From Swiss-Prot:
Taxonomic lineage from the root: Bacteria, Pseudomonadati, Bacteroidota, Flavobacteriia, Flavobacteriales
Role, per record: With S4 and S5 plays an important role in translational accuracy. Interacts with and stabilizes bases of the 16S rRNA that are involved in tRNA selection in the A site and with the mRNA backbone. Located at the interface of the 30S and 50S subunits, it traverses the body of the 30S subunit contacting proteins on the other side and probably holding the rRNA structure together. The combined cluster of proteins S8, S12 and S17 appears to hold together the shoulder and platform of the 30S subunit.
Subunit record text: Part of the 30S ribosomal subunit. Contacts proteins S8 and S17. May interact with IF1 in the 30S initiation complex.
HAMAP family reported for this sequence: Ribosomal_uS12_B
Residue list for modification 3-methylthioaspartic acid: D89
Protein name (record): Small ribosomal subunit protein uS12
A GO molecular function held by the record: tRNA binding
A GO BP annotation: translation
Length: 131
């Protein structure tokens, strides 16, 4: 506990909030190139083959990014757009690839939450909404 005299001399240091997505450098999204596309298994209670890509960003940093949705067209040297947002059961994966932007295709036959997966409006959905 500092004395009043010590506080007058030095003052208190402000604690700076550390960002959870450091590689974005305060940008909402970043462009990058896939260096490796692979699948990994999640942490203990869960079981699956999660699709992940290693991405080299335009600022020179390399990060692991999750590929959401069913099926994807990514391969090495694909240009992708990434956003922040971790995957809780994959250690070290703190970013998501944005579907439907740049080289990443949207999820095919997606009916709900289409904007999150870059899916275009199908004619069937259009007819239902008009009625």
């Amino acid at each position: 506990m500092p004395t009043i005299q010590q506080l007058v001399r030095k003052g208190r240091k402000n604690i700076k909030k550390k960002s959870k997505s450091m590689a974005l450098n305060c940008c909402p999204q970043r462009k990058g190139v896939c260096t490796r596309v692979y699948t990994t298994t999640p942490k203990k209670p869960n079981s699956a083959m999660r699709k992940v890509a290693r991405v080299r960003l335009t600022n020179g940093k390399e990060v692991n990014a999750y590929i959401p949705g069913e099926g994807h067209n990514l391969q090495e040297h694909s240009i992708v757009l990434i956003r922040g947002g971790r995957v809780k059961d994959l250690p070290g994966v703190r970013y998501h690839i944005i579907r439907g932007a740049l080289d990443t295709a949207g999820v095919k036959d997606r009916k709900k939450a289409r904007s999150k997966y870059g899916a275009k409006c199908s004619k069937k959905i259009n007819k239902i909404n008009k009625k």
